[in-house]
Curated annotation (Swiss-Prot):
UniProt domain AB hydrolase-1: residue ranges: 231-459
Species: Caenorhabditis elegans
Coiled coil: none
GO molecular function: monoacylglycerol lipase activity; phospholipase activity
PANTHER family: ALPHA/BETA HYDROLASE DOMAIN-CONTAINING PROTEIN, BAT5L PROTEIN
This protein's name: Uncharacterized protein F37A4.1
A Pfam short name: Abhydrolase_1
SUPFAM superfamilies on file: alpha/beta-Hydrolases
InterPro entries, A to Z: AB_hydrolase_1, AB_hydrolase_fold, ABHD16_N
Amino acid sequence: MPSFWTQISGPRLYGIFGQPNRQEPTLENLGNTVISFSAGIYYIASSLAFGPVILCYLYSRDWLTPAGMLTILKYAGYLTLIGYGARTFGRLFDETNSRFLDIWENEKNKKDDNSHAALKKYDFELLDVIPDFVARPNSDLWHLKPEVAEAGVVTRGLASWAIHAFGRHLIYPGSMALLKYMMRPNLNAARKLLVQNKNGQRLWIKSSEGDTLDAMFLRGTNQSQDLIICFEGNAGFYEIGVMNSPAQLGYTTLGFNLPGFGESTGLPYAVNTLAAADAVMQYAIQVLGYRQENIVLFGWSIGGFPVAWLASNYPNVKAVVLDATFDDLLPLALFRMPTFFSTIVEHAIRNHMNLQIDKLLARYKGPIRLIRRLQEEILTTAVDDQPENVRRATNRINWLLKSIIKDRHPELIQNLEPQVDRWLDMTPTERLMHSGVSLREESTQRKRLFDACNHYLIDFDANHVTPLDPQYFNIPHGRDTF
């Protein structure tokens, strides 16, 4: 039997793989609901965004006096007692939960060599688990240095406050507690299907930043020797994310949730995100046994950031596939924020969330494929009521395509950069018509430029969040000349 303290503070059990869906006992469910509600109140009250406002309100109502503070502590104590008390009593009379907590406690205290395998049969909140793999810090990894712009103390302070108070939540909404609470039932159900129906292997990987990553490995059905490592967007989860597209084609895939997403611990700051990506890469090479030459990096949306960084540090990877991504976060952030905040926004992005995918990819010279969403509504810098061709022309993946061609084939784009915009605006039929051979030197250069555009980018007629049709997932091959 688990200790009484483990019954109180142990992780929440969601279910058992291979068995019918678990229904929490009434008392346990009541306790978990109260605990989640209390955690939400604490999260809001202690946040940098709402905390100062709440403090001002409490001060105006004379709640910050000794008597007022005692009243607040009294009600907080009531919630704590009801939440943990109800949950504990519910667990005490639930044999399944007691058995799980006993295994979890033995694993935590390393009392039983078989407890780790036994624990993998359960789906639960990842609290104090022993990871399957611990990534080592690597001082040789290259990082894009922050662009420290000249700014006063006030600007620097406001920029730091903004990125920690609400900027991170806007950039990575998938880490918000409310969204995770709402998504938990769907993620649990999808994770169960991956393990039961697709023989998925759930992994716990610890990054060099100390975050525990929830990951999933799916063995493919085709004869390919390649591994597709999948990177989700800012509100994506491996359970219901981009891993499904290559998996449908029979590829072996490895997906994971970013720090703070799903059951992964931590928060998705840039350093944590990159440490997580490197930890997964280390696992693929050291444990799964894949060579760089057999690894394909596949990223959707903001997942292009860790993909580009990994490609710059592991230049021998087989290929990079980027779906619905962008060149630089700053233009998108400036477009969506009030103009008078522009200086603060620029300082916050460049010094705390410097997601410059184009500069990262400049260090990678291997095969790459961009997938542009024709109905893109997230990565554009045009208002919704503007014509479709205008919105399509402001898709930031267009700038990423130009950056790749400039880095790899500067002689093609020299004096012809507007022709890339022209090609991007063409229909597939128009592009085919311009693929003919011309004897004029300028036309020949333009044809070669269009060939390069065709090689690096394909269009997918969908909006930002539509799952990628598997037929658009093709591993690109390298090409040096056009």
